[in-house]
Amino acid sequence: MATQALVSSSSICSSAEAARKIVVGRRQIQSNSKKTSFVVRATSTPPVKQGANRPLWFASKQSLSYLDGSLPGDFGFDPLGLSDPEGTGGFIEPRWLAYGEIINGRFAMLGAAGAIAPEILGKAGLIPAETALPWFQTGVIPPAGTYNYWADNYTLFVLELALMGFAEHRRFQDWAKPGSMGKQYFLGLEKGLGGSGEPAYPGGPFFNPLGFGKDEKSLKELKLKEVKNGRLAMLAVLGYFIQGLVTGVGPYQNLLDHLADPVNNNVLTSLKFH
């Protein structure tokens, strides 16, 4: 009896030890499973790119690989691949193209307003008729108009080239080395030309006298608005060119003619699609 009791006790202990090992093993498996599952979920989460939450305009997988929304007005639209570093071999940098778009947009906004302003002011009788000319009659090649400025139009043209060339040269220097214009002597105006570190947005008392964009959020909104208006202005200037070639009059006169007789003065009738 004693022997049987000893065997039974040993058997019970062995069974208990085996059960304990099974329970511990299951807990380890469950723990490892949880760890493995967590690691898989973590590595499968895609990184969040800057500007990811944005509207996309005919964006492709390739364009989104280099247009990440960090630039103002970037909606992934690049059907020709102009900003693609792989397509150009790194010759054209997306930021350089964006910088060029901003500069050309600013010129276009000035040009769109300046091309139509003399017509409007002339019609209102605020400037002499000899200066209220359509934009295409004020160029130096060929000379046209009967305005009387302090110098002839050829002299004005050469002077404009010299001044614009100087300004563009300094602008390019600031792009190559941001802030460098604030270190070069320029008639005591260096402090106002130091820039903000972003060549496209120099800021300061000369380029931002009203202090727009004091915080990051408002500055981002203003950058986007500027790009949109610049793009619209570039299209407007293109429209001025086409209108001038087709109708032979300025854009303001085109508008007046259309308002006076919309049926006979519109895009279709001007292009003879009737």
Where are these regions (language model features)?
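Alpha-helical transmembrane segments and their helix-helix packing motifs
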Residues: 2-274
